[in-house]
Amino acid sequence: MITIERLEELHVALVQSIQLADEQVKFAGTAAEFLLDGSETTHLHVIKSDNEVVGFFKLDIAYAEHYEFSPEGSIGLRAFVLDKNQQGKGLGTGTVKALFPYLKANYSAHESIYLTVNYKNPAAFNCYKKGGFEDTIEQYLGGAAG
């Protein structure tokens, strides 16, 4: 069973142990970078499968202030990561599907969720689409990975 939780102190060491394939770091950053990025507007979360931390992501409640394509009242999904040993098991798609009811229960003030995904990362693109995201076909060319 997949669950989503806000990051707590007890999760930190578990998040630090999450490994990414070298080619994925350019898209989402490292666990260390993730742990340094929490703020009042960037909420850090963990992904659990059967109560084991297998990944993490950020919810950016100020996303619309920084990205023109994101309408007021939206929230941003950023740095979505699954441990490299947990990939290919359906956990990414399952987490994306679980995200929508989680947002409704915990972020109901936000009307929609947006993200950017690099075209050089087709596995992530497919995961988001299968999980329920819609492709707007708009291109955002400001990402660090090109």
State each model region's role.
Residues 9-12, 93, 119-122:
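Alpha-helix N-capping/helix-start residues
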